[in-house]
């Protein structure tokens, strides 16, 4: 991941990947162990997160996925239910098909398998949903999408530490997360909250990307 990110400019990127074989994770708050499940056929799951919106997280997600896809089998899942960006970033305006087992088939472009709530919300209507419904939709994207064999699944999370993020870290066996921020003090405070959330459930933060540094 570190080498792929360097292809997008001269910058100092420090990323350390830690591999954990234990799926039962003890949270930092002393809670009961969490049984986090892998996605069948997916080797590594990387969450791209931010504490604040508008920091370029979705742009970094698709560029990182595209760079990895040159040598690896890669999927990209846009989990921002309220404001999905992947349809516009990928230039896709169609709905995914379903298998005979009623699983969604990811759309393919740029040698990547792509899935977003924006692909199935044909009317582009705003999602006015409460937390429990959002959590169920998030879980469906893990269980009811036919990802096939992947080396990496990149997750583009919505900003903050809300229901989607909590559902994710509690139920999914993440390889790690990458935090995206900007130099402003408010953004840095929020990204620290996000990093603390991952730390409490022993999900390693692989790196922090400071975006828009020269603006």
Which residue ranges define each predicted feature?
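Hydrophobic anchor at the start of a short beta-strand
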Residues: 13, 73-74, 205-206
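Extreme N-terminal, non-catalytic leader segments
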Residues: 2-49
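Phosphate-binding/switch loop-helix module in NTP-utilizing enzymes
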Residues: 121-168
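Phosphate-binding loop that captures ATP/GTP phosphates
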Residues: 71-129, 135-136
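Conserved catalytic-core segment of NTP-binding enzymes
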Residues: 151-152, 158-215
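Short glycine/serine/threonine-rich phosphate/pyrophosphate-binding segments
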Residues: 54-63, 84-87, 160-165, 188-190
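Walker A/P-loop phosphate-binding motif and the immediately C-terminal alpha-helix
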Residues: 44-78
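Residue-level signature of catalytic and energy-coupling elements of molecular machines
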Residues: 42, 53, 78, 86, ...
């Amino acid at each position: 991941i570190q080498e792929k990110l360097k292809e997008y400019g001269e910058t100092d990127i420090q990323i350390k990947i830690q591999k954990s074989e234990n799926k039962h994770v003890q949270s930092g708050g002393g809670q009961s162990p969490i049984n986090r499940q892998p996605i069948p056929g997916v080797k590594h799951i990387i969450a791209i997160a931010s504490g604040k919106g508008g920091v370029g997280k979705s742009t970094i997600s698709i560029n990182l996925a595209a760079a990895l896809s040159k040598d690896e089998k890669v999927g990209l899942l846009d989990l921002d239910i309220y404001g999905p960006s992947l349809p516009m970033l990928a230039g896709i305006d169609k709905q995914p098909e379903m298998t005979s087992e009623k699983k969604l088939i990811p759309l393919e472009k740029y040698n990547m398998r792509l899935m977003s709530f924006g692909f199935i919300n044909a009317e582009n209507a705003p999602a006015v949903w409460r937390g429990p419904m959002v959590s169920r939709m998030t879980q469906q994207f893990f269980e009811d999408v036919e990802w096939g064999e992947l080396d990496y699944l990149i997750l583009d999370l919505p900003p903050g530490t809300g229901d989607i993020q909590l559902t994710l870290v509690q139920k999914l066996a993440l390889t790690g997360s990458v935090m995206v921020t900007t130099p402003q003090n408010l953004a840095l405070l929020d990204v620290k909250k996000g990093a603390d959330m991952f730390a409490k459930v022993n999900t390693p933060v692989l790196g922090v990307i400071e975006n828009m540094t020269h603006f």
